[in-house]
Amino acid sequence: MKKGTVLNSDISSVISRLGHTDTLVVCDAGLPIPKSTTRIDMALTQGVPSFMQVLGVVTNEMQVEAVIIAEEIKQHNPQLHETLLTHLEQLQKHQGNTIEIRYTTHEQFKQQTAESQAVIRSGECSPYANIILCAGVTF
């Protein structure tokens, strides 16, 4: 049995295949996922698992150098936005690097998901609970 934090074989596999600047999406239950993009569906029911639970597990295993977030989260989900910024600040300290935070429109965000290696769908049912993680290197 794998000893690391990620037991889901699909998530573990996609993270292990990421190269520098490749992207991986963690999203809420409502984000449309392009047919051409690998879908890893973790959603069990509304809110389970939460966006932050999935993001926490993924970022424990993935080196992150930048993130892309929809601008709309600031107005429509400010509590999650603050939680997300706190998580990214802690992740920077843990990884020992600066994580660039880029904002874009939700429409542009949805278009960018098509370029990702995979989209991991959580059970989150709050607005704009989505992030594109850009892979960094550990050296």
Curated annotation (Swiss-Prot):
It holds the Pfam family RbsD_FucU. One of its GO terms (cellular component) is cytosol. Substrate binds at D28, H106, Y128, A129, N130. It is found in: Cytoplasm. The active site is at H20. Keywords: Carbohydrate metabolism, Cytoplasm, Isomerase. One of its GO terms (biological process) is D-ribose catabolic process. It is an enzyme of class 5 (isomerase). It catalyses: beta-D-ribopyranose = beta-D-ribofuranose. Pathway: Carbohydrate metabolism; D-ribose degradation; D-ribose 5-phosphate from beta-D-ribopyranose: step 1/2. SUPFAM superfamilies: RbsD-like. It comes from the Bacteria. GO terms for molecular function: D-ribose pyranase activity; intramolecular lyase activity; monosaccharide binding. Disulfide bonds: none annotated. Its EC number is 5.4.99.62. The keyword Kinase does not apply. Homodecamer. Belongs to the RbsD / FucU family. RbsD subfamily. Catalyzes the interconversion of beta-pyran and beta-furan forms of D-ribose. This is D-ribose pyranase. It comes from Escherichia coli O6:H1 (strain CFT073 / ATCC 700928 / UPEC). The gene is rbsD.
